[in-house]
């Protein structure tokens, strides 16, 4: 059994990790940490886990994280970069669900996240954990930077087009919508029910922290810098990311065939039939990304629709997918989940 520890198990990504790992046949949950909730049983905070997780939260100092095979960090940005070094030195593999190891340019990361990076040496070796691109590198990684939710939906949507050199990488547009769980579990006015329901708004228009992450990933595939306009929106739903992506075609190509061919072997990417429009509820609770590609009126504009559950394929599910790769398991182990309906 793979001994697993979770640092920061009280947020939405933490409880989603617990939900998925509690039914994983090859995992033994050994430690779940929270300084604030130390001593509290996990199922007292999350009754949904009653009968599935028989552990209490402990402080990071009390938890034997060094005795784990792998530790997940489901913490705010800036925590993993301080704690991961000693774990890696002890032979523990690390999967960070925050942004500490995603951006290779340290100065760029510090600009967007407003703090000095504590372990740039780990950034240099960390593998960006988007399996559909970096599967082989993830298998041998000591540190995996789990992608963000928007970056997952956007990169999977643009990937086949960029690989085929079918679009102009200088003029990409990502118009994205997220449910309120993407903002985390902390109490904030803009995510209160009375504030978020019956409303719809853009945010981060001048610049969002996921922008450099998306640009970095797409540029690596394109072999050149990309021009990307990224505008996220907050929608009155709990879970889900919907990305509407626009690009200018450089050549005539069978778009449906291109996407079907690229993702034919991918368990967690579902290319819908031509003319489809994926819904966020069709992936709710699952690790699946559903994609549809369109060419309106036969123009030179291609439109890609990409939907994921922000807490699963956009966070905890993808982290478990990476765990499976790192330990030589079938990629879908513990992730064969039928989406919830309604």
Curated annotation (Swiss-Prot):
Catalytic residues identified in the record: 149
UniProt key word Oxidoreductase: yes
Enzyme Commission number, as recorded: 1.2.1.38
Pathway(s) it belongs to: Amino-acid biosynthesis; L-arginine biosynthesis; N(2)-acetyl-L-ornithine from L-glutamate: step 3/4
Protein keywords: Amino-acid biosynthesis, Arginine biosynthesis, Cytoplasm, NADP, Oxidoreductase
Annotated InterPro entries: AGPR_AS, AGPR_type-1, NAD(P)-bd_dom_sf, NAGSA_dehydrogenase, Semialdehyde_DH_NAD-bd
Gene3D superfamilies: Dihydrodipicolinate Reductase, domain 2, NAD(P)-binding Rossmann-like Domain
SMART domains: Semialdhyde_dh
Protein name (Swiss-Prot/TrEMBL): N-acetyl-gamma-glutamyl-phosphate reductase
């Amino acid at each position: 059994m793979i001994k697993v520890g979770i640092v920061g198990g009280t947020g939405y990504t933490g409880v989603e990790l617990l939900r998925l790992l509690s039914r994983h046949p090859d995992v033994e949950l050994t430690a779940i940490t929270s300084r604030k909730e130390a001593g509290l049983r996990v199922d007292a905070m999350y009754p949904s886990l009653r009968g599935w997780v028989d552990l209490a939260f402990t402080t990071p100092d009390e938890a034997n994280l060094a005795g784990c095979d792998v530790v997940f960090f489901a913490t705010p940005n800036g925590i993993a970069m301080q704690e991961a070094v000693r774990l890696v030195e002890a032979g523990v593999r690390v999967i960070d669900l925050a942004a500490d190891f995603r951006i290779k340019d340290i100065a760029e990361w510090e600009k967007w996240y407003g703090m000095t990076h504590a372990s740039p040496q780990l950034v240099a070796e960390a593998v960006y954990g988007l399996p559909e691109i970096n599967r082989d590198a993830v298998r041998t990684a000591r540190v995996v930077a789990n992608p963000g939710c928007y970056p997952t939906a956007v990169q999977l949507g643009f990937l086949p087009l960029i690989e085929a050199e079918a679009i102009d990488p200088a003029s990409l547009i990502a118009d994205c919508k997220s449910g309120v769980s993407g903002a985390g579990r902390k109490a904030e006015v803009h995510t209160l029910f009375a504030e978020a329901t019956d409303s719809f708004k853009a945010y981060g228009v001048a610049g969002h922290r996921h922008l450099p992450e998306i640009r970095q990933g797409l540029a690596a595939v394109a072999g050149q810098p990309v021009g990307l306009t990224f505008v996220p929106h907050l929608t009155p739903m709990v879970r889900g990311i919907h990305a509407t992506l626009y690009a200018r075609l450089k050549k005539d190509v069978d778009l449906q065939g291109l996407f079907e061919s690229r993702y034919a072997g991918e368990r967690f990417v579902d290319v819908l039939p031509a003319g489809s429009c994926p819904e966020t509820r069709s992936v709710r609770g699952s690790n699946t990304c559903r994609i549809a590609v369109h060419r309106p009126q036969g123009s030179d504009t291609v439109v890609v629709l990409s939907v994921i559950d922000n807490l699963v394929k956009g966070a905890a599910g993808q982290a478990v997918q990476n765990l499976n790769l790192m330990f030589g398991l079938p990629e879908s182990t513990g992730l064969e989940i039928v989406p919830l309906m309604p």
